[in-house]
């Protein structure tokens, strides 16, 4: 059913009040706090209509109304005013990105911390599945006599290393030679393309350095296994306990239990936002997972070039300060791209 301007203004006033107070909103409150030019009785009648239309609900213990998921959805899509970040909040996000960082996962963790502090909700972030990650470089670096460090770098900026044991007779120049061979054969391949024929080609090229083939190969394999594990970051879950929606011990326990399931969080982020460059808002029952039916999730992807590198999201109660979260996500997204491209380069073809 169509909402006329009067109903829209009343619905916006109720939701704005409820977001800030967490208390059911009555007609007298709306009449007193908002200059709508309407009597309390008129507002009461309009609120009854909005409830009948599914935009508001009435808790059993209160004469006031609270927004339904449908009400929040209409608010977010059509009524919500834009917010601006404070200079302090902008500085917080910029500082998180400007810290000396040489790996994408470090950047993501720093940004997650900043977003959680600014929004006062929980932030979640994930790097994508790595089967299609392209190997950018392999280095074998001498550490001490009898030990070397295998370092694998992917096109998405992920860096993993593995300490290996080697013969004490192996010279540094041998390790440079081995690094060159591994780079020649592996650079530009996806993780899924590294197979036995490729390994045999490396073996044929090793020549006098055959004795360190297996240790280095084991080190590369170990790095790939580390890369292949999805990386998920969660910050500020404890923030949720500050909201009355989570004052119930059982409700809080269910939510915190959900937040430690990293595989589940990774799936939530992947399912919530598969479209590049879009910001997606899921409200209450729009979420598939039962423990999130009373939460809202706002997610976006971040990219380098035209490649989606990962997803970041904010989760809070449905009584979320949506405009504030969207302002933070929009600013973060605008700055994230340049920092991601600095870390991993604009050419993500792996060639």
UniProtKB/Swiss-Prot annotation:
> What SUPFAM superfamilies does its record include?
GAF domain-like, Winged helix' DNA-binding domain
This protein's UniProt keywords: Repressor, Stress response, Transcription, Transcription regulation
Q: State a single Gene Ontology molecular function.
A: DNA binding
Identify one Pfam family in the record.
Answer: HrcA
Q: InterPro entries from the xrefs?
A: GAF-like_dom_sf, HrcA, HrcA_C, WH-like_DNA-bd_sf, WH_DNA-bd_sf, WHTH_transcript_rep_HrcA_IDD
Q: Name one GO biological process term.
A: negative regulation of DNA-templated transcription
Query: Which PANTHER family has this protein been placed in?
Result: HEAT-INDUCIBLE TRANSCRIPTION REPRESSOR HRCA
The similarity annotation says: Belongs to the HrcA family.
Q: What does this protein do?
A: Negative regulator of class I heat shock genes (grpE-dnaK-dnaJ and groELS operons). Prevents heat-shock induction of these operons.
Descriptive protein name: Heat-inducible transcription repressor HrcA
The species this protein belongs to is Acetivibrio thermocellus (strain ATCC 27405 / DSM 1237 / JCM 9322 / NBRC 103400 / NCIMB 10682 / NRRL B-4536 / VPI 7372) (Clostridium thermocellum)
GN (gene name):
hrcA
């Amino acid at each position: 059913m169509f909402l006329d301007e009067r109903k829209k203004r009343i619905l916006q006033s109720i939701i704005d009040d409820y977001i800030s107070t967490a208390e059911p909103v009555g007609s007298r409150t709306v009449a007193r706090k908002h200059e709508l030019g309407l009597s309390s009785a008129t507002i009461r009648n309009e609120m009854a209509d909005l409830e009948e239309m599914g935009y508001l609900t009435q808790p059993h213990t209160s004469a006031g109304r609270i927004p339904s998921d449908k009400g929040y959805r209409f608010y977010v899509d059509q009524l919500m005013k834009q917010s601006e970040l404070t200079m302090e909040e902008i500085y917080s996000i910029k500082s998180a990105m400007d810290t000396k960082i040489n790996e994408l996962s470090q950047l993501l963790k720093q940004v997650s911390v900043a977003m959680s502090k600014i929004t006062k909700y929980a932030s979640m972030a994930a790097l994508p599945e790595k089967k299609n990650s392209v190997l950018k470089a392999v280095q074998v670096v001498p550490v001490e006599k009898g030990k070397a460090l295998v370092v694998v770098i992917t096109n998405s900026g992920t860096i993993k290393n593995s300490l290996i044991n080697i013969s004490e007779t192996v010279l540094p120049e041998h390790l440079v030679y081995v690094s060159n061979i591994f780079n020649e054969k592996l650079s530009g391949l996806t993780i899924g393309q590294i197979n036995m024929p490729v390994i045999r080609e490396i073996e044929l090229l090793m020549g006098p350095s055959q004795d360190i083939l297996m240790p280095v190969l084991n080190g590369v394999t170990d790095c790939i296994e580390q890369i292949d594990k999805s990386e998920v970051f969660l910050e500020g879950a404890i923030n949720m306990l500050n909201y009355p929606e989570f004052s119930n011990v059982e409700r809080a326990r269910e939510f915190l239990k959900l937040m430690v399931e990293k595989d589940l969080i990774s799936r939530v982020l992947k399912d919530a936002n598969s479209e590049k460059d879009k910001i997606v808002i899921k409200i209450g029952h729009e979420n598939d997972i039962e423990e999130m039916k009373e939460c809202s999730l706002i997610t976006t992807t971040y990219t380098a070039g035209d490649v989606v590198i990962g997803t970041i999201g904010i989760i809070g109660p449905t009584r979320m300060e949506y405009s504030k979260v969207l302002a933070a996500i929009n600013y973060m997204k605008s700055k994230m791209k340049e920092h991601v491209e600095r870390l991993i380069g604009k050419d993500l073809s792996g060639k």
